[in-house]
Swiss-Prot record:
This is Ribonuclease Z. The keyword Membrane does not apply. It comes from Deinococcus radiodurans (strain ATCC 13939 / DSM 20539 / JCM 16871 / CCUG 27074 / LMG 4051 / NBRC 15346 / NCIMB 9279 / VKM B-1422 / R1). Homodimer. The active site is at D60. Zn(2+) 1 binds at H56, H58, H162, D235. Zinc phosphodiesterase, which displays some tRNA 3'-processing endonuclease activity. Probably involved in tRNA maturation, by removing a 3'-trailer from precursor tRNA. Its EC number is 3.1.26.11. Binds 2 Zn(2+) ions. Signal peptide: none annotated. Its cofactor is Zn(2+). InterPro entries: Metallo-B-lactamas (IPR001279), RibonucZ/Hydroxyglut_hydro (IPR036866). Zn(2+) 2 binds at D60, H61, D235, H297. Belongs to the RNase Z family.
Length: 331
């Protein structure tokens, strides 16, 4: 399953914390890292982050990076990966280098920064024992598949327009194969190790000492179920052309986490600054066929009474729209 939590407060910096849990293992992702967004995340979770993915490198999306880096800078228990749009390596390299690394020769952590464009992923490696001073170019890898793929999760990037390069991220769990209990009852069968063999694609399975062909049992008993999914899109232009482009890319995604920077009345200002309104976000959720819309990244220009109006405007188009948990008093 995918569990996600919006970090940070309304009208302040936000981030998204996601855990993919297959029951056999976990993958943890941090999407953006604004100022103080890690304050409510337990230290052991920050230290267990597998990937930090930036939408872009404006200050309100990276201001909390020092907090993340401070507890992970010499991490060798797992790989250290940072992701972002073109230009991310140059900016993030300065963040890595921006300390007095007088003990660096005794330290051994490796960090990789991946820049994602439409065609490829360009990766640079940085070594702590070199005080991160050398950007080792590991080349470009064509984007022929997901950015990240683990047994629990796959991550893809969606290019966005924010007066410069910006990325949205789509996270999908693998599909699941479940056993139909009614089918077991109908066939008068008892669960056992043979079900694992059936799921694994065996041609025959042994049930109560009898060898039986697997194909008819598979048709009667196994049901495929799509895995959970979510998308995170923030700081982007959402005009009619972008709605038409993005909706098919997000088709089938269960939950959309979208910025809610502007009220509908300020649509012109949103377009000028390459941000969205709550109505536009709701329209995208409806066109993409999402089941839920979570709005975040509110502008400081609005007060709580305005937030309620902004949410009502979104719900008029997409009833399953909401803000992050407890952002509105009484919710």
């Amino acid at each position: 399953m995918l569990s996600a939590a919006v970090l940070g407060q309304p009208t302040r910096d936000n981030a998204l914390w996601v855990t993919a849990d297959s029951g056999k293992g976990q993958t943890r992702l941090l999407l953006d890292c604004g100022g103080h967004t890690l304050d409510t995340l337990p230290l052991h979770e920050v230290q267990a982050t597998d990937h930090l993915l930036f939408s872009h490198l404006h200050m309100d999306h990276i201001a909390g990076f020092d907090d993340f880096f401070r507890v992970n800078f010499d991490r060798q228990s797992r790989e250290n990966h940072l992701w972002g749009p073109p230009g991310a390596a140059r900016i993030l390299a300065h963040r890595l280098q921006g300390y007095w690394w007088n003990h660096a020769p005794q330290l051994r952590a490796t960090w990789r920064i991946h820049e994602v464009d439409d065609a490829a992923v360009h990766t640079w490696r940085f070594e702590l024992h070199e005080a991160f001073e050398i950007a080792h170019d590991e080349g470009r890898t064509p984007r022929t598949g997901p950015l990240i793929e683990t047994p629990h999760l796959r991550v893809d990037a969606v290019p966005l327009q924010h007066q410069g390069p910006c990325l949205g991220y789509v996270l999908r769990e693998p599909g699941r194969v479940n056993v139909d209990p009614a089918g077991l009852t109908r066939l008068d069968l008892t669960p056992g190790p043979w079900l694992a063999a059936l799921k694994a694609g065996a041609e025959e399975v042994e049930i109560a000492g009898e060898r039986r062909p697997a194909a008819p049992l598979r048709a009667e008993l196994l049901r495929e179920e799509a895995g959970d999914s979510l998308a995170y899109l923030t700081d982007f232009l959402l005009d009619e052309a972008e709605l038409a482009r993005l909706a098919p890319l997000l088709a089938g995604v269960r939950t959309l986490y979208l910025e809610a920077q502007y009220a509908p009345a300020d649509a012109d200002l949103a377009a000028r600054n390459h941000h969205t309104t709550t109505e536009q976000g709701a329209t995208l959720a409806a066109r993409a066929g999402a089941q839920e819309l979570v709005l975040l990244h509110l502008s400081r220009r609005y007060r709580e009474a305005d937030w309620r109006e902004m949410l009502r405007a979104a719900q008029a188009i997409f009833p399953a729209a909401r803000f992050a948990e407890s952002w509105l008093r009484g919710t």
